[in-house]
A protein has these predicted regions:
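Flexible, glycine/threonine- and acidic-rich loop/arm segments that mediate assembly and lattice contacts
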Residues: 1-244, 251-254, 263-325
Length: 325
């Protein structure tokens, strides 16, 4: 276990800036209605097949005898929570040595942060938040059958069936950029399966967003910046042939993949520990001159009916400047 010590973590002065991708938009967008469970497996809903429209052919004579009864079967869909756990340890020597500064310093400057333990705990919570964001999107489902097997929650991408997937890699023109026509086709898949396209959000990475803006300019489409607010997150909107779609950056998506999801049917599912809560900070037994804590939590994804979402894969990873007109 790595313990924060004086020489391992020198003290510096100056403003602190986080480097790298650290935002969690998917977790934010589905966080309006968090759920709670006391069981590792939980239901994400039931589905049944809608009846197919047809014209009956019943004569007056045939109507004298009632037809055979029929029934509709239902299927339950489930997911699981999984454990997120990290440990933080800072030595007594490090905590008592915050006045020793390394690097370039001016007179009267102080170490930033001033409290190493608080800083390490906060950064560890950021790490867990990024683990949660990645897992809710990319998680591969595993239901444990023994104590030494880890439960793994099913992410939104794995939940989406092939019937709601467009693979651009299989097109004759591959590899191709993402266009709003393709987005409209994905909306059509959701519609044809019986899903609601009213609140759909399109999640893309930075390269794919540039491709969409490039396509919009070529076709005189209008992207309205920050015109919609979902759970405090301002997102852009664009009008397609099948309705208005919100567009937002989601950095945890795999390269070449775009996600259309309905946040109104998704939710994080927490499994709190009695009398402790969830994602709590707890001191661990001392083995020497250091303070040691663990952060523990259990969480899974309620992705709702899978046909309410869609994904587009096989998108080129080239920026518009690298694509031919």
């Amino acid at each position: 276990m790595a313990v924060a010590t004086s020489f391992a973590l020198p003290n510096y002065s100056g403003m602190l800036f986080v480097k790298g991708k650290h935002r969690t938009p998917f977790s934010t967008l589905i966080g309006a209605r968090p759920m709670q469970t006391n069981h590792v497996e939980f239901a994400v809903g039931q589905t049944y097949d809608a009846p197919i429209g047809s014209q009956p052919e019943i004569s007056e004579t045939a109507s004298l005898t009632a037809p055979e009864p029929s029934f509709v079967t239902r299927t339950q869909n489930t997911n699981v929570t999984q454990i997120f756990q990290e440990t933080v340890a800072v030595s007594y020597g490090k905590m008592s040595n915050m006045g020793t500064l390394s690097g370039l310093n001016a007179a009267n400057q102080e170490a930033n942060p001033a409290d190493e333990l608080a800083f390490q705990i906060a950064r560890t919570m950021e790490k867990i938040a990024m683990q949660v964001e990645y897992t809710l999107i990319n998680g591969v489902y595993v239901k444990a059958n023994a104590d030494n097997v880890a439960n793994k929650t099913r992410g939104i991408l794995a939940a989406i069936p092939n019937s709601n997937t467009i693979d651009l890699q299989s097109t004759p023109q591959a590899p191709v950029a993402l266009t709003y026509d393709t987005v409209a086709e994905a909306l059509a898949l959701i519609h044809d399966q019986g899903g609601d396209t009213t609140d759909i959000i399109l999640g893309v990475n930075a390269t794919t967003l540039l491709q969409l803006n490039w396509d919009a300019r070529k076709n005189n489409m209008t992207i309205v910046p920050a015109s919609r607010n979902v759970n405090g997150l301002a997102i852009d909107t664009v009008i397609t042939a099948l309705g208005t779609v919100a567009v937002t950056l989601i950095d945890s998506l795999p390269d070449g993949t775009a996600l259309l999801f309905n946040p109104t049917v998704c939710a994080p599912v927490f499994q709190p520990v009695p009398e402790k809560g969830n994602f709590f900070l707890e001191p661990l037994a001392k083995t020497g001159a250091a303070d040691k804590y663990q952060i523990f939590g259990q969480l899974g994804l309620d992705h709702g009916p899978s046909f309410y979402h869609a994904k587009i894969t096989g998108i080129t990873t080239k920026k518009p400047s690298e694509l031919s007109e």
